[in-house]
């Protein structure tokens, strides 16, 4: 189920002195089953872009196609689109409202007019997918830890059984362990064939999890490629206020000191493996 942008521009408050072009002639295609990371400076259009992917926003000009459905067409039933494309906002736990975890996660499936048995199946499955014990279903979501509450919010989206999952800074405010757990969950969804789009300010996260990385700047597509292709262009990223993953910075420092580090090192695991390889080579060279 590809998502296609065709020359999309979006203007907030058009026709007023406060008009602002948040997207400017964006064209791209997100293929089925890929994990995309979206990065860019504050105000670059990242959130506006993803809100076009399930019809929360419509283009001022251009077209957005999701599974062949034209989201620019006012006749398109956006409910069908939102059942296929799940969107998880920043701090989604702030949107929890059900008296119980079950009631919260069941909200979406019930709005799809599903039978009680199917709703229960989806809720139980979604809780298991986010690593929560289904036996928790009768607990209040408001007594959970931040990481658990975020999992409940994520389960509420997964219960709709979308084919595309879009996440806007899903680890914001979590401790390192909570961050890793959420990202590992999302990475697991991608490995099952789900299309995942992750908006993040963390270069390390997109380097580790994304198949492709989109860089937005001033509402336009600034760069697009694999993590190692993009982070090899460090000077261009720094020119627009972005950094590189810690592993890339470390690899650059080691190369300056004469270490033979491969050019495609972008994650810390890859950096460790490369360093071990160099050290093993030196140890072998020192043997009589």
Swiss-Prot record:
Keywords: ATP-binding, Cell membrane, Membrane, Nucleotide-binding, Translocase, Transport
Domain ABC transporter: 3-243
Cellular-component GO terms for this entry: ATP-binding cassette (ABC) transporter complex
EC number in record: 7.-.-.-
Top-level taxon in the UniProt lineage: Bacteria
UniProt enzyme class: translocase
Entry protein name: Energy-coupling factor transporter ATP-binding protein EcfA2
Organism: Symbiobacterium thermophilum (strain DSM 24528 / JCM 14929 / IAM 14863 / T)
Gene name for this UniProt entry: ecfA2
């Amino acid at each position: 189920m590809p998502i296609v942008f065709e020359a999309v521009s979006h203007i907030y408050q058009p026709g007023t002195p406060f008009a602002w072009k948040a997207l400017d002639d964006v064209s791209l295609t997100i293929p089925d089953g890929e994990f995309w990371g979206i990065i860019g400076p504050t105000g670059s259009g990242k959130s506006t872009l993803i809100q076009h992917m399930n019809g929360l926003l419509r283009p001022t000009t251009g077209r957005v196609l999701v599974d062949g459905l034209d989201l620019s067409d006012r006749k398109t039933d956006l409910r069908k689109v939102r059942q296929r494309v799940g969107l998880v906002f920043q701090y989604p736990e702030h949107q929890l409202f059900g008296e119980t975890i079950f009631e919260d996660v069941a909200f979406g499936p019930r709005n799809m007019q599903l039978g009680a048995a199917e709703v229960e199946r989806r809720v139980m499955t979604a809780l298991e997918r986010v690593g929560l014990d289904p036996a928790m279903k009768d607990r209040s979501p408001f007594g959970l830890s931040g990481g658990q509450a975020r999992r409940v919010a994520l389960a509420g989206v997964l219960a709709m059984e979308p084919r595309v999952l879009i996440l806007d800074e899903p680890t914001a405010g979590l401790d390192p362990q909570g961050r890793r757990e959420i990202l590992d969950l999302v990475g697991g969804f991608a490995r099952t064939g789900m299309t995942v789009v992750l908006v993040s300010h963390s270069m390390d996260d997109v380097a580790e999890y994304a198949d492709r990385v989109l860089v937005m700047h001033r509402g336009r597509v600034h760069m697009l490629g694999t993590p190692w292709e993009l982070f090899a262009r460090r000077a261009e990223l720094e020119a627009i206020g972005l950094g590189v993953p810690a592993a890339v910075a470390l690899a650059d420092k080691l190369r300056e000191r004469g270490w033979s580090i491969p050019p495609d090192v972008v994650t810390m695991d890859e950096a460790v493996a490369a360093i071990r390889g160099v050290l093993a080579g030196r140890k072998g060279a020192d043997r009589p």
